[in-house]
Swiss-Prot record:
Organism from which the protein derives: Shouchella clausii (strain KSM-K16)
PANTHER family: GLUTAMYL-TRNA(GLN) AMIDOTRANSFERASE SUBUNIT A, TRANSAMIDASE
Protein name: Glutamyl-tRNA(Gln) amidotransferase subunit A
Lineage per the UniProt record: Bacteria, Bacillati, Bacillota, Bacilli, Bacillales
Subunit and interaction comment: Heterotrimer of A, B and C subunits.
Matches recorded under NCBIfam families: gatA
Length: 483
């Protein structure tokens, strides 16, 4: 049994009782990475020397006087900047980028005295649903290494599922925390837009991006969100609201809780095993005292199209900063300034990033702005209204995280539209800005299935309460892959 099979609370108790020390935890992490990462390929850069030095210092501290995250090893998705630790966004254009500052979430974690183990693989600039778009390596699913771990935070989900770290940070623009969490059988939360600072998150789509926690259990997830959430003066979109003690929301009580189940989330395109897993989960929650009814989110059918117009348009603007002048890769193949811009971007960006930049530039161009970008934003407003209407009568919305379990590596790389459809059930949440969590709810042919719980704006606490009740009434979160 690995130390990382324990909850954060239990690990903290062991530290406080001096039965283990921080160096033991760091040792477990690096040993596990050495043992299995040649198969999983989750980590891009390890920070071993600094991590071990910090662990030795923390060994001298009385853990009983510290918070639950004290001394805990963590992995950071490679689009979250870390001072003095390479941050690549899994792109050749940032292959040797060494940030001069920490993201706000990293600063908060350092304040909580966690230990950063290293930076984790992802789809390039967070654009992808399978982790196959990384310029450096393809992360695999620990449950079956022939299958994808999901994307774009597939490396973070795989690292946690494989027991390399007890928890990790990811980012979610259209499902990039929840979909990998579902595929890898772990717990992943996309917080309300504005709940967690984006300062230091390399921007993909600024109105959609949100950093969130990926963990083994719901309780661990609540602890990690509490540590990273809160207002940040450096991020004008972060909400100036108090951060609730999320761990205290895990009361075990959901009697009378009202659940809405969108008919659009359990209809055509959703596999039979996924549909059955959702209804089985609803039966579990019903026995615990909740009530559920079918509801409708009619504009969800337009979410995928609206998302790819909005996200690509914002990416087109955000990625204009990677030009070979200020930082990152610069081509050697240029006779003049214009050639330098063109060739740097042509050589530095991968195919999917180029595809989205082109799509976004087209949608923002003169003559097409009203027809595409403006219309997509109008659809976004209608999608948000759908959620608002349902939440007037219901506490949470529940459905599958993904239409199917994970697919084989290489199965969809030649068909971008089929790949995009993997996020059809997660994208509406980002467009509406509401929080949502995925947690394990079953297996099909040895691959995990994910249940998605969606909450009201800034009501992550209710999501955690429901998820915790379900997790404790089932055994799915206790299952581990055998690597």
């Amino acid at each position: 049994m690995s130390l990382f099979d324990h909850s954060l609370t239990k690990l903290h108790e062991l530290l406080a009782a001096k039965e283990i020390n921080v160096s033991d935890l760091v040792d477990v992490s690096y040993k596990r990475i050495a043992d299995v990462d040649s198969k999983v390929k989750a980590f891009l850069t390890l920070d071993e020397e600094r991590a071990r030095d910090l662990a030795k210092k923390l060994d001298e501290v009385d853990a009983s006087e510290k918070g639950v995250l004290f001394g805990m090893p963590i992995g950071i998705k490679d689009n979250i900047v870390t001072k003095g630790l390479r941050t690549t966004c899994s792109s050749k254009i940032l292959e040797n980028f060494d940030p001069i500052y920490d993201a706000t979430v990293v600063t908060k974690l350092r304040g909580a005295e966690t230990v950063t183990i290293g930076k984790i693989n992802m789809d390039e600039f967070a654009m992808g649903s399978s982790n196959e778009n990384s310029a450096f390596q393809v992360t695999t699913n620990p449950w079956n290494t022939d299958y994808v771990p999901g994307g774009s935070s597939g490396g973070s989900a795989a690292a946690v599922a494989a027991g390399e770290v007890p928890f990790a940070l990811g980012s979610d623009t259209g499902g990039s925390i929840r979909q990998p969490a579902a595929y890898c059988g772990v717990v992943g939360l996309k917080p309300t837009y504005g709940r967690v600072s984006r300062y230091g998150l390399v921007a993909f789509a600024s109105s959609l991006d949100q950093i969130g926690p990926i963990t083994r259990t719901v309780e661990d997830n609540a602890y990690l969100l509490e540590a990273i959430a809160g207002h940040c003066p450096a991020d004008s979109t972060s909400a100036d609201l108090p951060v609730p003690p999320y761990r205290e929301s895990l009361t075990g009580e959901i009697k009378g809780l009202r659940i809405g189940v969108p008919s659009e989330y359990i209809g055509d395109g959703v596999s039979e095993e996924m549909r059955k897993a959702v209804f089985d989960a609803l039966n579990v929650l019903e026995k615990e005292g909740a009530v559920w009814e079918e509801v409708s989110l009619p504009y969800s059918k337009y979410a995928l199209a609206a998302y790819y117009v909005i996200a690509s348009s914002e990416a087109s603007a955000n990625l204009a900063r990677f030009d070979g002048v200020r930082y990152g890769y610069r081509t050697d193949n240029a006779d003049n300034l214009l050639d330098m811009y063109k060739n740097t971007r042509a050589e530095g960006f991968g195919d999917e990033v180029k595809r989205r930049i082109m799509l976004g530039t087209f949608a923002l161009s003169s003559g097409y702005y009203d027809a595409y970008y403006k219309k997509a934003q109008q659809v976004r407003t209608l999608i948000k209204k759908d959620f608002d209407d349902v939440f007037t009568n219901y506490d949470v919305i529940i459905g599958p995280t993904t239409p199917t379990p994970a697919f084989k590596i290489g199965a969809k790389t030649d068909d971008p539209l089929t790949m995009y459809a993997n996020d059809i059930l997660t994208i509406p949440v980002n467009l509406a800005g509401v929080p949502a969590l995925s947690l394990p709810c079953g297996f099909k042919d040895g691959l995990p299935l994910g249940l998605q719980i969606i909450g009201k704006h800034f009501d992550e606490a209710t999501i955690y309460r429901v998820a915790d009740v379900y997790e404790k009434a089932t055994n799915f979160s206790k299952e581990k892959p055998s690597l």
